[in-house]
Amino acid sequence: MDTNSPKSIDKDANSTEVDAAEQDAASVKINSTRASPNGSDLLNDDSEAAKITTNEKQSSPVDSHNESPNDTTINKGEDGNENEVDNVNNNDKKEDEDNVEENEEEADANEEEEEDEEDDEEDEEDEDESGGGRRKRARHDRRNQFLDIEAEVDEDEEELEDEEDEIGREDGFIEEEVGADYVGDDRRHRELDRQRQELQSVDAERLAEEYREKYGRSQTVVGDTSNVPQRLLLPSVNDPNIWAVRCKIGKEKDIVFTIMRKAMDLQYTSSPLEIISAFQRDSLVGYIYVEARKQSHVLDALNGVLNVYTNNMILVPIKEMPDLLKVQKQVVELLPGAYVRIRRGKYAGDLAQVDNLSENGLTARVRIVPRIDYSDGLKRKNSATRPQARLFNESEAFKSNPSKFSKRGPRLFLFNNEEFEDGFLVKDIRISSLITEGVNPTLDEVSKFNPNNEDLDLSSLALSVKGGHAEFQPGDHVEVYVGEQTGVSGVVENVRGSVITMVSSDGLRLDVPSRGLRKRFRHGDYVKVIAGKYKDDTGMVVRISKDEVTFLSDTLMTELTVFSRDLGEASSAQAVNSAYELHDLVQLDVNTVACIFSVDRDTYKVIDQNGGVRTVLASQITMRHSNRRGVATDRNGAEIRIGDKVKEVGGEGKQGTILHIYRAFVFLHNRDIAENNGVFSARSRNVATIAAKGARISADLTKMNPALSNGPALPPVANLKRTIGRDKAIGATVRIRRGPMKGLLGVIKDTTDANARVELHTGNKMVTIPKENLLYTTKTGELISYTEFIERSRGIRPGSISTADGPNVPNWAQGARTPAVANGSRTPAWNTGSRTPAWNSGSKTPAWNSGSRTPAWNSGNKTPAWNAGSRTPAWNSGNKTPAWNVGNKTPAWNSGAKTPAWNAGNKTPSWNNGTKTPAWNANQTPMVANGTNTSWGQTPAYGGFSETNWDTEDNSKPYTAPTPGAWAAPTPGGWDDEEGDSPKYVPPSP
């Protein structure tokens, strides 16, 4: 039904109907708003009420000339009341037409008033909108999405009447008379009245409880959390548990980060981690802590995480949880001169001294003893070992890398983009990278920053030492050095925590805090170190400076400076360790000896024969050497003993007094050397005598004895023969037996015919040595010459004839050579078997009393002994008597007892015997040359022939040459192979 045409209506005639409709709509709207928080739901129960409320919100009064207050667009509702609404509108139209003319004048007058009121209302609405809060968004019924409940709005502005504004501002429910045509309002009103009565009948406490349950949890309180009682923050049995899980030391933070990443990855999956938190404490190494409801949740979170050991997890008790999570932040104020340590990097753990602080307090300029490898350019980078800490050396730095070296001042250098001043590395480091607590520097470390012990500030050192308060005992002599009573001294009477009760020298009892006291000592007191590096060391006080006490150590025999709080009075000066004393020579293992240079409470610091320094326990020492009469020779061959003052030849040139001598090593001591308390080791041949103990000036007689200095006498080396193929001496271990390098060991690397290239064990130096000057070491340790070494390598037995010289050339060192007048065992020798008799032996050939041998020519026709069956004549002669007509001569050639039988095999002699004596071409007996005898000639050959008969005298020289050097023992003459020729004997040469 279309009602868009504007109509002019009479206000008085239509006031009743319009006011009733407006009041009903306003009543429904107000009641629905004030009924309850869910009042909007009540209006949605009926579609018709929704239509009226919606049209009322979207419509406003318009100009009386253009639009009537009852001119409203209503869509078809769900209740089917369209016909009733049409009838009401038709009646209104008829009445309007009848009264149009009567109300024209009044409408014109009212039009101006309404415009003025409209302007005022617009101003008030603007003020309300600007001053009011944010408008609440209207709630819409989900069922209205299928209905057209919007009213058509005219182009002109609409405004509410004054009466409507007053109705909207009323607090109570205005009950107006409603016509019979307004259906459904009573039912809704009754429903609202019933709900109000129910709310009023409810008990106030019960209502408050309902509101508390409904809105209590969503309320938030804004306030200061510091006012919350601490007991409310303590964990209880309702809180999750904390599990301590063991892990690999140093991996605690990595494991916590791994768990965090795992939780983030599984957060939006079907199986997220069910743990609440995971954390670690730097002070509790080797553990991480996981907060969870169940232990299985912890195991699931740690599944697959490396370096975690979940076998024995520990449930942290509830009462220990606050201590575990408590963080006590201590702010340490750094001052210039304080000592700190580097946290990480190449200088991790090194001591540094604060030089200055930045303005923002985040960085500090520190001095560090540098660690520089000046040969780093020649080595591969990222070496596993870090260089030794020592002061900067500008000369070595310049030689190492001149391009990165520059001088900026007298003691200021720039090297490798790092600044060095007075030998120290000066560097700006963040304070977070420094360890400022528990530094505990030692005096040795501090002395590096004060090399001359000048201006040694132990007060700043005390600030860096953890637990800087002394431990006082009743009876200690103390002195007050802080506060109003500075300088007062006395004796401790009682100790109550940090409060010390002392009795002053005036007899007054004073209560002084322990931090203001220090122990007091006098010169000459025996003290004992009760804390620190030199704990349990004893000594006598020699110097006192404020809180610093210097005493002479009984074990180290040096002056040590410590804090007075670390000292206590000692009854005697006995050292704690008595098993071994300072400077004892001890045996560590089979090949290592060492000298003790420092004695601590449970350990010893020793230096071995190779210069290595180590710290050992008493159980690691095998024995103690007590050889006080050791003797050795120095570089010049002079005798050195314990107590002599010697000096190193080469190297650093250090000098000192000999403490011990062990084999080829000496242990020396020099009080002027601070390193290792002045103890060092060297080889005896690398030192030279400066002053001998007792002013010994006698020569070393051992060097004059060749048997002691050169070893056993060796025969001269024969001519070295050229070897074929690879020399067997290559790779052999040799010892030089003469020359400037005598006694050194080495290995042959290459050889020539006469020389060998030897790599010495000392210094790996390569030298060229003649082969005849070398002694070769066998597997048994025997030293042999080069010739014998080669022969043994070829399988030739020593003493046999060398095949290289042939069978005719004797070997001088062999006993079977022919002849040698100076050697009694050479040929001839009377008792050497079948050799020619010696020239001076009494048993000439044949001897006159040699049994049944061939009778001598002047033996008086003696017959061989009756029982000489095996003697000459021949072995098968049957003891025949010589021929009847031969006189004194040897029996006939064809007798059964020929001497020797021609076919007697190896009998003496036989012309065809391969081993004739002498052999025809081997080692012949020297012959007479030019009528004179020589001892070096060859043995006469067998090939001489007799020019006379057998019974005549033969004067041929080859057959009458006597044995060399023996004029009374002629050699038997040769015999011819012709018939009738037989051996014969001739008298000695005239």
Swiss-Prot record:
Residues 29-41, 52-74, 824-862 have a biased composition (Polar residues). The spt4-spt5 complex mediates both activation and inhibition of transcription elongation, and plays a role in pre-mRNA processing. This complex seems to be important for the stability of the RNA polymerase II elongation machinery on the chromatin template but not for the inherent ability of this machinery to translocate down the gene. This is Transcription elongation factor spt5. Keywords: mRNA processing, Nucleus, Phosphoprotein, Repeat, Transcription. Component of the spt4-spt5 complex. Interacts with RNA polymerase II. GO terms for biological process: mRNA processing; regulation of DNA-templated transcription elongation; regulation of transcription by RNA polymerase II; transcription elongation by RNA polymerase II; transcription elongation-coupled chromatin remodeling. Its main location: nucleus. The keyword Acyltransferase does not apply. It holds the Pfam family Spt5_N. Residues 97-130, 149-176 have a biased composition (Acidic residues). Residues 471-498, 520-547, 727-754 form the KOW domain. Belongs to the SPT5 family. It is found in: Nucleus. The keyword Acyltransferase does not apply. The modification Phosphoserine is found at S36. GO terms for cellular component: chromatin; DSIF complex; nucleus. Disulfide bonds: none annotated. It comes from Schizosaccharomyces pombe (strain 972 / ATCC 24843) (Fission yeast). Sequence repeats lie at residues 818-826, 827-835, 836-844, 845-853, 854-862, 863-871, 872-880, 881-889, 890-898, 899-907, 908-916. It comes from the Eukaryota. CDD domains: KOW_Spt5_1 (cd06081), KOW_Spt5_2 (cd06082), KOW_Spt5_3 (cd06083), KOW_Spt5_4 (cd06084), KOW_Spt5_5 (cd06085), NGN_Euk (cd09888). The gene is spt5. Residues 1-176, 818-862, 946-990 are annotated as: Disordered. One of its GO terms (molecular function) is chromatin-protein adaptor activity. Residues 133-142 have a biased composition (Basic residues). Residues 818-916 are annotated as: 11 X 9 AA tandem repeats of T-P-A-W-N-X-G-[NS]-[KR]. Residues 960-974 have a biased composition (Low complexity). InterPro entries: KOW (IPR005824), KOW_Spt5_1 (IPR041973), KOW_Spt5_2 (IPR041975), KOW_Spt5_3 (IPR041976), KOW_Spt5_4 (IPR041977), KOW_Spt5_5 (IPR041978), NGN-domain (IPR005100), NGN-like_dom (IPR006645).
